From Swiss-Prot:
CDD domains the UniProt entry points to: STKc_IRAK
Subcellular compartments: Cell membrane
Domain Protein kinase, chain residue ranges per copy: 667-948
Organism whose genome encodes this protein: Arabidopsis thaliana
GO CC field: plasma membrane
Alphabetized SMART domains for the sequence: S_TKc
Residues given in the record as ATP binding sites: 673-681, 695
GO molecular function: ATP binding; protein serine kinase activity; protein serine/threonine kinase activity
Glycosylation (residues): 46, 75, 83, 110, 194, 208, 229, 256, 277, 317, 337, 361, 386, 469, 559
LRR-type repeats, residues: 87-110, 111-135, 137-158, 160-182, 183-206, 208-232, 234-254, 278-302, 303-326, 328-349, 350-372
Membrane protein topology class: Single-pass type I membrane protein
Record's protein name: Probable LRR receptor-like serine/threonine-protein kinase At1g53440
């Protein structure tokens, strides 16, 4: 009894103690929430957290994080005001940087008072659980995980949300329209995902937004006009979204903006947006937005708080405003890659801030040496013969001495080292925000761009995570990186062909199961202005982080004395993992070696020395005679026909007529390889052994030599793997010559329609590759290049094939040389019957959709192996295209596939290509897709849903009459082609043993109005063709 008595007293004592501690109003977590929290942490694979009913009071949650490069942050907040302060409820859960694994537990939906979930920088997968729509959530932050799947539509049901922060994940698909229900939303941060499609119109309802970031996604459509509704917006980020311009005028309503970042827009050029009321602006980035205007004066007067200004890679002209002297707060200014003129203001030159003015057209250059300049002015002044201008300031970086180097080895971001027999130069300059450095006479680099959110980030990287294997070359352990643009230059290089090797290894992300492994680095690679890689991902191409990858280019031509390697960030990938400022281009090492035999340096024989002396004497004598003649002392002074070209900044190589005559054996007919609407083409071999193609243009161009050279310079800047490369030009007397790369396999027309001896019998994979190549080339001309070009004459004869049967478009930009005005209504039709879009052929209405139509015809020819203009299966069908529409209605499109292929082709790909061809040849230009979409369709990335054009829904009705008009158009158009042209076409089709000859319909002596007068009443039906065709029923 005594034992039981004492035990009872002990129990009572414990009870009294507990009551004394907690009282009658003990603030405890309900048992159901305790169990819910334990389940959540078990599923998050963190077993160390201690969850008790008393945890809200003693706050002993016992969080333990794995080793990580960033200090983790944890916080669980309770509200204990429920039921007269006797019950606690969890309201906020913050677990940042714990590398939590697994999925986001759906049990979060059982915490009925939870208003915040912050799981930033972990290693979570899966998607957002639907159960979250059951709770009054206000903040959802999951940036820096590996969450995936369609963007969660259930978020649109949580109308209490004020902050949605989901950057740097893997969400896909379009934004759900019901996000417009979140009228309390203040922050919507969804950058660096894989979101596609348009920004939904319903988001116009989000009038409380203060921060909207969607950069680094692959969106479509234009920047919506309704962003002007977001008048409370403080920050707007639209970097690298692939959206179309222009920036809408409604943006002027956003008077509270402090940060505006819009980059890499597609579409037409546009004026500078009206931002003058944004007086609180601190960071303004409008990079590559196709803006063609002077810089507004108000930037210097209204935006006095500006810290960062980036207007690079536009088409800005005029001078730098004097009002910029009032920008006392700025740290970074980027006006590079524009067309600015005039002298650089002295207050800019005296500034010690980061300023990049490279690649402009300034005058009055400074006298400082290249390495004394604090402002990056590389390649910003015309190439002139005045040697007082520093070489680094002049276009194309001409060699200040003899161009004698033939190799280059750089350990980017690392020390000098020797690998095998090669000595790699060190590259340790720590500057990079706006820097040009010519480390030696052999090479230099230019770096540009400020880091997002981390001005102090480094420009040199080391193998922080010890990823590089000891057996891997040492240069992979270091790297140079840049936030935006990184260029390396090989200087004073000999002319000729080189092999370029670029060495990469991702050394800034880890290879473990932590958030530090989740970074994605994407950038573009150009060599000599030619795009080699778009959205290049080092880790992906190498098969993991810390693994080496070599990108090699076997033939790179140096025609001047400079070789340029350009790595460029376009706003894609992540920029917060493992810390802010880890993104942008990165490279470990560069090697450049010659493809030609290099002089060994052995001493010259006496005979060779004597020959050199004699040759020098002869040359000097000739020079004296030339000077005497030009000054009038010998035969009088003659006017130099090309005097107006002196001092011009030629953006392309210059050839002499003597060089070209020697190369082509004086334009020997045996070397003639083709003839088109712009003149004959000859094969030639230069003295250094390089094979070229020379196009002999008509000398009747309406433009003067200066304008001609300007246009050619602009065309030569258009460089893409699927465009024929323009090496240069020659203008002497009446000769206008263009020098192109030589393509060994001639034209696509010859490969498909030539004689049995000439045809290449292309297999299906090659046809598919050729079709995609043409589409990529046109997409570049229309949407990606700075100079937007409509080709006007896309056809099989204007597509050439190299040794590997890669397609390259020729004659791009040449129709522009005969233009007098730049308007949508072209009075001079340049094209070929059977390939011209109806609105262009009949009305002269010219847009890039005319090229889309022509591409559709060529695509049809590639699949069928038949010429659109020569193949008529039945008398009532005018073109192959006409027959294709019939087969489409009958469901028999595959009958068009070239019988030579037999069964060796993909039916799925063939149907895809044929449907795309019909989609592109839609009579209505507005229903034809842009070429970038065509590329995606051909690659199977997006579905093809071509509209069906009904020909014979009512054989006696209007539809049949509309297609009958197409026959009248063909007959009328053929009557307009000169007898000479028809004779040439007849010759090309009947005699295929010689060079492939083709003619375009381009008659400069007759404009549209004259042609219409000559037609008279007999062709009234075809003049109404456009009106007829646009009424064709579309399903």
């Amino acid at each position: 009894m005594g034992f039981f008595f004492s035990t009872r007293k002990g129990l009572l004592l414990i009870i009294f103690i507990c009551l004394d501690i907690f009282g009658s109003n003990a603030q405890l977590l309900p048992e159901d929430e305790v169990q819910t929290l334990r389940t959540i942490f078990r599923k998050l694979q963190n077993q160390t957290v201690n969850i008790e009913r008393t945890s809200c009071l003693d706050r002993k949650w016992n969080f333990v994080a794995e080793s990580t490069s960033k200090l983790p942050t944890s916080n669980i907040t309770c509200d204990c005001t429920f039921n007269a302060s006797s019950v606690c409820r969890v309201t906020n859960i913050q677990l940042r940087g714990f590398n939590l694994r697994g999925i986001i537990p759906p049990e979060f939906g059982n915490l009925t008072r939870l208003t915040e979930i912050d799981l930033v920088l972990n290693f979570l997968s899966g998607t957002i659980p639907t159960t979250l729509s059951q709770i009054p959530l206000e903040i959802l932050a999951v940036t820096g995980n590996r969450l995936s799947g369609p963007f969660p539509p259930q978020l649109g049901q949580i109308t209490t949300l004020t902050d949605v922060i989901m950057e740097s994940n893997l969400f896909t698909g379009q934004l759900p329209p019901n996000l417009g229900n979140l009228r309390s939303l203040k922050r919507l941060l969804i950058s660096s995902n894989n979101i596609t499609g348009r920004i939904p119109e319903s988001l116009s309802n989000l009038k409380n937004l203060t921060n909207f970031r969607i950069d680094g996604n692959s969106l479509s459509g234009k920047i919506p006009d309704f962003i002007g509704n977001w008048t409370r917006l403080v920050r707007l980020d639209l970097q690298g979204t692939s959206m179309e311009g222009p920036i809408p005028a409604s943006i002027s309503n956003l008077k509270n903006l402090t940060e505006l970042r819009i980059t890499d827009l597609r579409g037409p050029t546009s004026p500078f947006p009206d931002l003058q009321n944004m007086t609180n602006m601190e960071r303004l980035v409008l990079r590559n937005c196709l803006i063609r205007e002077p810089i507004p004066e108000y930037i210097g007067t209204s935006m006095t708080m500006l810290k960062l200004l980036d207007l690079s890679s536009n088409m800005l002209n005029g001078t730098i405003p004097d009002t910029f002297r009032s920008l006392n707060a700025f740290n970074f200014m980027y006006l590079n890659n524009n067309s600015l003129t005039g002298p650089v203001p002295q207050f800019i030159l005296d500034s010690k801030q980061n300023i990049d003015l490279s690649y402009n057209n300034f005058t009055q250059p400074p006298t400082l040496s290249c390495n004394q300049l604090d402002v990056n002015l590389i390649s910003s002044y015309p190439s002139v013969t005045n040697n007082s201008v520093q070489w680094c300031l002049r276009k194309d970086l001409p060699c200040p001495g003899d161009a004698h180097h033939s190799s280059l080895f750089i350990n980017c971001g690392g020390n000098r080292l020797k690998v095998d027999k090669d000595e790699y130069a060190d590259d340790l300059n720590k500057r990079g925000a706006s820097t040009f450095s010519s480390v030696s006479e052999r090479w230099g680099y230019s770096s540009s761009g400020a880091w997002l959110g981390n001005d102090g980030a480094t420009y040199l990287a080391t193998d922080t995570f010890n990823l590089i294997n000891e057996s891997t070359p040492e240069y992979y352990k270091t790297a140079r990186l840049a936030s935006q643009s990184l260029k390396y230059y090989g200087l004073c290089m000999r002319r000729g062909s080189y092999k370029v090797q670029l060495y990469f290894a991702e050394i800034m992300f880890s290879n473990d199961q932590t958030y530090s492994s989740l970074g994605r680095r994407l950038f573009d690679i150009y060599v000599q202005g030619i795009l080699l890689e778009r959205d290049f991902n080092i880790a992906q191409r190498a098969g993991g982080v810390g693994k080496p990858f070599l990108r090699q280019v076997d033939e790179v031509q140096v025609n001047g004395s400079t070789l340029e390697i350009h790595l460029k960030w376009t706003g894609k990938g992540t920029n917060v993992i493992p810390t802010r400022g880890v993104y942008g281009p990165l490279i470990s090492a560069i090697t450049v070696t010659p493809n030609f035999k290099v002089d060994t340096g052995k001493p010259l024989s006496n005979g060779v020395v004597a020959g050199i002396v004699i040759a020098a004497c002869v040359a000097f004598g000739l020079l004296v005679l030339v000077i005497l003649r030009l000054t009038g002392y010998l035969g009088g002074k003659e006017v130099d026909e090309n005097e107006e070209l002196r001092g011009l900044d030629l953006q392309t190589g210059s050839f002499t007529l003597k060089q070209i005559k020697r190369a082509t054996n004086n334009f020997d007919p045996e070397n003639k390889i083709g003839e088109g609407g712009f003149g004959p083409v000859y094969k030639g071999v230069l003295a250094d052994g390089m094979t070229i193609a020379v196009k002999q243009l008509s000398s009747k161009s309406k433009q003067g030599n200066r304008e001609f050279v300007t246009e050619i310079g602009m065309i030569s800047a258009l460089q893409h793997p699927n465009l024929v490369k323009l090496y240069g030009c020659c203008i002497e007397g009446k000769e206008l010559l263009l020098v192109y790369e030589y393509l060994e396999n001639n034209s696509l027309a010859r490969a498909l329609f030539g004689t049995e001896k000439q045809r290449l019998h292309l297999d299906w994979s090659t046809r598919n590759k050729v079709c995609i190549g043409i589409a990529k080339g046109l997409a570049y001309l229309h949407e990606e290049s700075r100079l937007k070009i409509v080709h006007r004459d896309i056809k099989a004869t204007n597509v050439l094939l190299d040794l590997s049967l890669n397609a390259k478009i020729s004659d791009f930009g040449l129709a522009k040389l005969d233009e007098e005005e730049n308007t949508h209504i072209s009075t001079r039709i340049a094209g070929t019957i059977g390939y011209m879009a109806p609105e262009y052929a009949m009305r002269g209405y010219l847009t890039d959709k005319a090229d889309v139509y022509s591409f559709g015809v060529v695509c049809l020819e590639i699949v069928s192996g038949k010429s659109n203009t020569n193949y008529r299966p039945k008398e009532e069908f005018i073109y192959l295209l006409d027959w294709a529409y019939v087969l489409q209605e009958q469901g028999s499109l595959l009958e068009l596939v070239d019988p030579d292929l037999g069964t060796s082709f993909s039916k799925k790909e063939a149907m895809r290509m044929l449907n795309i061809a019909l989609l592109c040849t839609n009579p209505s230009p507005t229903l034809r897709p842009p070429m970038s979409s065509v590329v995606s369709m051909l690659q199977g990335k997006i579905k093809v849903q071509p509209p069906l054009v009904k020909r014979e829904a009512d054989p006696s009705g209007s539809a049949a009459m509309r297609f009958k008009a197409l026959e009248h158009l063909s007959q009328d158009s053929e009557s307009q082609v000169s007898t000479y042209t028809r004779n040439k076409e007849h010759k090309s089709s009947s005699s295929m043993d010689g060079p492939w000859v083709d003619s375009s319909f381009s008659d400069p002596s007759k404009d549209v109005s004259l042609l219409q007068q000559e037609e008279g009443n007999s062709s009234s039906s075809s003049r109404r063709l456009l009106d007829d065709l646009t009424d064709v029923e579309i399903e």
